[in-house]
Amino acid sequence: MCTLYNEPPTRSPRAFPLFSALAVGLIAVVAAAVSAVDPSELRRLVSTYTGLSFSNTTFDGVDCTLAEQYVTDVLPVKGFHILCIHKNHPEGELDITAFKDGNAPSIKIQSKYDLADLKTQLEKTLEIPEPKDDVARKYKQPYAFFTPEGARRETLEDIMNQIVFLFEGGQFIWPGIRIGHQTVVKEVAGKGDVVLETLSLTPLVFSVDEFLKDDEIDIIMALSLEHLKPSTVTLMDGHEDRAATDWRTSTTYFLSSSKHSKLDEIDQRVADLTKVPVDHQEDVQVLRYEETQKYDHHTDYFPVEHHKNSPHVLESIDYGYKNRMITVFWYMSDVAKGGHTIFPRAGGAPRPQSMKDCSTGLKVSPKKRKVIVFYSMLPNGQGDPMSLHGGCPVEDGIKYSGNKWVWNKARD
């Protein structure tokens, strides 16, 4: 949104009759330059200054070159499509400029002014697959449209004459665009605007400084420390007889958000940041890592192929179509040395030979009040094996942290 200036005091256009025509002419020139950015804001300004009223279509339109700011030239983003939808024909047809998988060059598509036909043309041109079997037809979420700010859109009127994102997996995911890119997320509960910085595209990892507050961390610690117990893991096929400490040596406690109003506020903050509703979240898993304690490389989502011998796990994840999509990892202490979060496959690296190796990959240092946001699912709804990550051993100090897991579907 482009805000030109603060709204001036209301005035009558007839107070200065000699200048009214000139004012309208000047505003018309401005219209040519900025109407593509926010036509509704421009109409409001014109109406305020001149007293004139305009129909909803007077300045309607969209500059499709603005869609290019969301394009990445690094690699295809499977299941993420950028669309600029423009009603351009008197007979009501739609012109669509699409960036398939978030990449250039653009593709031109036409459809009738009809949502069903628009979807048909998009499915054909963007090669959106149909559900592959009865299980997929029952459990897979349909693709969905969102604004670039993360608001879901469902009607043709909602997506016409603007830029929208299409996610085949049905949930919003922030585009990484490029490493170092900064996205401003507006109106995050308890924080106002926050900056989401891209740390990695494969897997998709962001960071946000100063996301938590000291008083919130104090409350979390006070409610959790006496309840900490050795951490557990969900064992995959073939590992049923092994101890959790083979991989993980921290202590942990799931802290219910009902324990304090501050936790409810953080839940809303996470929802505002990720653009996924609160009812998709698990309670935060509070963690303590003392010196030498660690968590070997693992994924936070549950791959179907690793749990074929566990019917209860498969049922709980809708046979792969319901899963942990996002981890918002909270850092609640500074650590003098060690305790990094590592992504060994960052940049598309092969699977490491050792799940204990902390020498290679993207390493994020613990920093109090900071969070990292990483995605375990791709925009097409599939799990991302590149999201493999681990907690490196703490070498000096104590690391307090928290896992806030956000699922792609509402929690039961």
Predicted regions and their residues:
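Fe(II)/2-oxoglutarate oxygenase catalytic core
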Residues: 2-412
